[in-house]
Amino acid sequence: MIIAIDGPSASGKSSIAKALGSRLGFKFISSGYFYRIITLIAQKFTLNEYDLLSESKILELVLQNDIKFNGVDFLLNGVNVTSHILNERIDLQVSLYSSYIGVRNIVNKKLREIVKLKDDNYIIEGRDITTVVFPEAKVKIYLDASVKVRALRRYNQRDDDITLNELEQALERRDEIDQNKEYGKLKLAKEVFYIDTSYKCLDDVCDIIIKTFNLKKK
């Protein structure tokens, strides 16, 4: 069974998906980490956050590198890069690279291969997970929150010099990009269960999703 969790950046997708995985005994996968690894690959060949590779070049580089998920960590050519893909520079570019249709096709294929390779129960989170990648998921959840709340969450996770106001502006730009993508845009899927997490704690959101999950099982 698949529980698919969609929604904008910093809406709580990863934290809630991980907690749900622990409570339900499901395996957790984040599509966003794949896009971040691809952005990390690109940044090895660029000078700064304003320097972007073409779609054809990034696809060429992706095919030259081995990206894997071992059930816990994300590996690039056998090296654990999970802790290296959450930084401001990647934040600024990941939406741009993930807007490339070829890049999205590669990530979506990897996600489907992971699920197909081992018949198991999965919680998979990411933008367009409920609309494009796994529209057939038994349970589809869309998590949302205000920009101010999402910026504060991201601010509390960071240890760099970015300000709260800068994070708000970055999230607003990212929302605009994600909502206007030609392919895989951020939107509500059919039969999706919408949850505003702005003023809900993690356990309360998990309880709501588990109730939905139990109803869908019947």
UniProtKB/Swiss-Prot annotation:
- What EC number(s) are associated with this protein in UniProt? 2.7.4.25
Cellular component aspect of the GO annotation? cytoplasm
**Kinase keyword on record:** yes
Q: Does the keyword Cytoplasm apply?
A: yes
Q: Where does ATP bind?
A: 7-15
Matching entries from Gene3D superfamilies are given as: P-loop containing nucleotide triphosphate hydrolases
Q: What is its main location?
A: cytoplasm
Query: What broad class of enzyme is this?
Result: transferase
Catalysed reaction(s) here are: CMP + ATP = CDP + ADP; dCMP + ATP = dCDP + ADP
Q: Which residues form the signal peptide?
A: none
InterPro entries to which the protein is assigned, alphabetical: Cytidylate_kin (IPR003136), Cytidylate_kinase_dom (IPR011994), P-loop_NTPase (IPR027417)
Q: What one GO molecular function would you report for this record?
A: dCMP kinase activity
Protein keywords: ATP-binding, Cytoplasm, Kinase, Nucleotide-binding, Transferase
For this protein, the record's SUPFAM superfamilies field holds:
P-loop containing nucleoside triphosphate hydrolases
Annotated Pfam families: Cytidylate_kin
Q: Where in the cell is it found?
A: Cytoplasm
GO biological process annotation, one example: pyrimidine nucleotide metabolic process
Family statement drawn from the similarity comment of this UniProt entry? Belongs to the cytidylate kinase family. Type 1 subfamily.
Official protein name in the record: Cytidylate kinase
Q: Which organism encodes this protein? A: Borrelia hermsii (strain HS1 / DAH)
